[in-house]
């Protein structure tokens, strides 16, 4: 077979930078899916992307489909011919549809009977004739939430399309994508190199764009250049650049020919909290801040321009001029905000509604304050400090800085609290109350921070469920799933002795008459159980292990975690499979018993050696198991119970549980119930697979 390399490029106006990678990855993925459906082999595929182009190359693409034979089964012989051996209408219709006569059909014999058969030879189609339609389908499936139209065309895409190039080796693939005909024309950089040029071969795409068009279409190469040059530029001024990957990706998606430059701002702005300056530089201007080795912000920033200038200082001065007013605004807001304390802003929180049925933010912070103090008492933290932090937790929402830079809520509260003379624990708690903010974020560990973060989330969860607005489907406007995961993670990772039932009840009590859903507490607890499952699945824990623990519905997160670890360890033991099966058998037997089960085991009614041995083994273990379960040492307890395997196996081999003698039967059921209860102290291991 013959092979060639394929290039497809769609030249557009500037694409959304935050979507560029996803669009490019989806484009090539959709196309390779089409190739596989068409049974066209290839060696590899690589996406390319720049602000004004989506492209990919497919290496060693076969030039035609392979010929193949397709078996087309017809009617069974009994239905294909009548009693006189003449073809029926069914047989003739099938043959006509396949372009043959009934006499030309073969016979297919199987164990189930005999059928007419036609082995049709299907000649493979040239790849070139399939490419256009496959590329169009790949584009149609791109994740574009808001497509747009341009000109007089009815075609829709994420941005207007100007060029389309499809080359199979050196051959132009005729066709049209998004209303634009395929041609060899490739557009270069807007301001450097050739405005456009013709590409002679798919293999020359990247090199021709770089040399003639002054465009680096290799996304990863462009990103690597920016990262390397920015690190070098920061080191040159004695600092370290903050090259957060999300911003690095966005900047990579904004430039075709990256040139890294260093600029400065006045040192006086360093009196403003660094987070505000960084927020402005990164969020508004797409600049990389520079820190010293101690983590202190330096009066420099690194930025990436899309052009090689004969006088870079002009570009540097321009960027310094642009950022200065933004930093001056931050300075003004900070100086203005300092004139009022966080406590003095509490009254203004009365004017802001948190949620119509749940009251104002002032009422919310009063609830958070009381709940944080309650939690503090439960974990031996300072209740007064926790209550104080809860009370001040939302005051920074009324500051100029947070109104302008909303993502700084909490962070600015910390800075203002320090200026107001609050304790460091209170100040830090204001900053950490929203943690964890996203998957993978750290959780607060300082006691006061823990109390406020838990109270803040529990107030929201219980309140929103309490007015009947639980999340439905994918919709979660109050981010309750994130809040619930946050509560669980804070409790788990700090090993806190807290119970969800107690926390929910206290939060519900503090909401008072605001709540109209009388099943709120039950629903919130069930919601937490669902988050337990989601969280542990994300951590790679087997579903059957999670279900085994969920069956016991432990409501203390730290206890839940201990059980998960213990059952996961038990599952790895050699005895686990047999004991899980035995527990399932016991569960089924006990479920069929009518009336109340006996709880006392009579030694006089133990007549078989196997039941005597099992009872004796259980009696030996119980004094060891009781303190282990009391201390939540489930792993050691289950390891001891694993030693019962042989006794349990022998019992089921030698003993008839449902004996005719009622007394013997009830005694054996009591023995099995006792066995199962020991395992149920940890989990329902009958659910292990």
From Swiss-Prot:
<dbReference type="InterPro" id="IPR015944">
    <property type="entry name" value="Gly-tRNA-synth_bsu"/>
</dbReference>
<keyword id="KW-0067">ATP-binding</keyword>
<keyword id="KW-0547">Nucleotide-binding</keyword>
<comment type="subunit">
    <text>Tetramer of two alpha and two beta subunits.</text>
</comment>
<keyword id="KW-0963">Cytoplasm</keyword>
<keyword id="KW-0030">Aminoacyl-tRNA synthetase</keyword>
<dbReference type="GO" id="GO:0004820">
    <property type="term" value="F:glycine-tRNA ligase activity"/>
</dbReference>
<dbReference type="GO" id="GO:0004814">
    <property type="term" value="F:arginine-tRNA ligase activity"/>
</dbReference>
<dbReference type="Pfam" id="PF05746">
    <property type="entry name" value="DALR_1"/>
</dbReference>
<keyword id="KW-0648">Protein biosynthesis</keyword>
<dbReference type="GO" id="GO:0005829">
    <property type="term" value="C:cytosol"/>
</dbReference>
<dbReference type="GO" id="GO:0006426">
    <property type="term" value="P:glycyl-tRNA aminoacylation"/>
</dbReference>
<dbReference type="Pfam" id="PF02092">
    <property type="entry name" value="tRNA_synt_2f"/>
</dbReference>
<protein>
    <recommendedName>
        <fullName>Glycine--tRNA ligase beta subunit</fullName>
        <ecNumber>6.1.1.14</ecNumber>
    </recommendedName>
</protein>
<dbReference type="GO" id="GO:0006420">
    <property type="term" value="P:arginyl-tRNA aminoacylation"/>
</dbReference>
<dbReference type="GO" id="GO:0005524">
    <property type="term" value="F:ATP binding"/>
</dbReference>
<dbReference type="InterPro" id="IPR006194">
    <property type="entry name" value="Gly-tRNA-synth_heterodimer"/>
</dbReference>
<keyword id="KW-0436">Ligase</keyword>
<comment type="similarity">
    <text>Belongs to the class-II aminoacyl-tRNA synthetase family.</text>
</comment>
<dbReference type="InterPro" id="IPR008909">
    <property type="entry name" value="DALR_anticod-bd"/>
</dbReference>
């Amino acid at each position: 077979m013959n092979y060639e390399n394929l290039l497809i490029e769609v030249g557009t106006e500037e694409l959304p930078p935050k979507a560029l990678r996803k669009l490019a990855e989806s484009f090539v993925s959709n196309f390779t899916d089409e190739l596989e459906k068409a049974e066209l082999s290839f060696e590899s595929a690589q996406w390319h992307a720049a602000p004004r182009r989506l492209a990919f190359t497919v290496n060693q693409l076969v030039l035609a489909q392979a010929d193949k034979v397709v078996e087309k089964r017809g009617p069974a012989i009994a239905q294909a011919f009548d009693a006189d051996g003449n073809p029926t209408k069914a047989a003739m219709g099938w043959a006509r549809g396949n372009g043959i006569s009934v006499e030309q059909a073969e016979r297919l014999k199987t164990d189930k009977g005999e059928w007419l058969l036609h082995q049709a030879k299907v000649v493979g189609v040239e790849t070139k004739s399939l490419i256009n339609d496959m590329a169009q389908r790949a584009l149609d499936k791109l994740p574009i939430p808001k497509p747009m139209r341009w000109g007089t065309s009815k075609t829709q895409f994420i941005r207007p399309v100007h060029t389309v190039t499809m080359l199979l080796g050196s051959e132009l693939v005729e066709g049209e994508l998004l209303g634009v005909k395929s041609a060899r024309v490739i557009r270069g950089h807007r301001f450097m190199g050739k405005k456009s040029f013709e590409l002679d071969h798919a293999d020359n795409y990247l090199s021709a764009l770089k040399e003639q068009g002054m465009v680096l279409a290799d996304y990863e190469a462009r990103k690597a250049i920016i990262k390397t040059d920015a690190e070098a530029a920061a080191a040159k001024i004695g600092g370290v650049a903050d090259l957060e990957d999300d911003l690095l990706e966005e900047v990579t998606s904004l430039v075709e020919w990256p040139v890294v430059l260093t600029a400065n701002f006045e040192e006086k702005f360093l009196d403003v909290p660094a987070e505000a300056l960084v927020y402005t530089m990164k969020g508004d201007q797409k600049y990389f801040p520079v820190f010293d080795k101690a983590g202190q912000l330096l009066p420099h920033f690194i930025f990436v321009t899309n052009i090689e200038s004969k006088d870079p200082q002009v570009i540097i001065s321009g960027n310094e001029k642009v950022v200065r007013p933004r930093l001056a605004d931050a300075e003004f807001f900070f100086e203005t905000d300092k004139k009022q304390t966080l406590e003095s802003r509490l009254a203004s929180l009365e004017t802001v509604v948190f949620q119509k049925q749940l009251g104002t933010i002032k009422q919310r912070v009063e609830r958070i304050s009381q709940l944080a103090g309650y939690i503090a008492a439960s974990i031996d933290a300072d209740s007064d400090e926790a209550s104080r932090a809860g009370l001040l937790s939302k005051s920074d929402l009324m500051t100029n800085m947070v109104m302008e830079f909303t993502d700084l809520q909490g962070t600015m509260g910390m800075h203002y609290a320090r200026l107001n003379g609050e304790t460091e624990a209170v100040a830090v708690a204001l900053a950490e109350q929203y943690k964890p903010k996203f998957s993978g974020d750290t959780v607060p560990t300082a006691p006061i921070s823990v109390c406020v973060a838990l109270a803040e989330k529990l107030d929201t969860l219980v309140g929103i469920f309490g007015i009947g607005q639980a999340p439905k489907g994918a919709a979660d406007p109050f981010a309750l799933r994130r809040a619930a995961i946050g509560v669980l993670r804070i409790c788990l990772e700090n090993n806190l002795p807290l119970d969800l039932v107690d926390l929910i009840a206290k939060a519900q009590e503090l909401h008072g008459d605001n709540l109209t859903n009388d099943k709120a507490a039950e629903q919130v607890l069930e919601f937490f159980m669902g988050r337990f499952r989601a969280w542990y699945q994300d951590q790679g824990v087997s579903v059957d292990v999670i279900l085994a623990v969920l069956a016991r519905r432990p409501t203390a997160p730290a206890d839940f975690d201990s059980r998960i670890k213990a059952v996961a360890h038990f599952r790895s033991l050699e005895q686990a499979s047999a004991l899980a099966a035995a527990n399932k058998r016991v569960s089924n037997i006990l479920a069929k018993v009518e009336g109340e089960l006996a709880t006392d085991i009579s030694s006089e009614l133990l007549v078989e050696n196997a039941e005597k041995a099992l009872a004796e083994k259980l009696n030996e273990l119980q004094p060891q198991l009781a303190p282990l379960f009391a201390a939540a040492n489930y792993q050691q307890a289950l390891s001891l119970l694993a030693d019962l395997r042989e006794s349990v196996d022998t019992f089921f081999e030698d003993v008839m549980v449902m004996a005719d003698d009622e007394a013997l039967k009830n005694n054996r059921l009591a023995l099995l119930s006792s066995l199962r209860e020991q395992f149920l102290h940890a989990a329902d291991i009958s659910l292990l697979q």
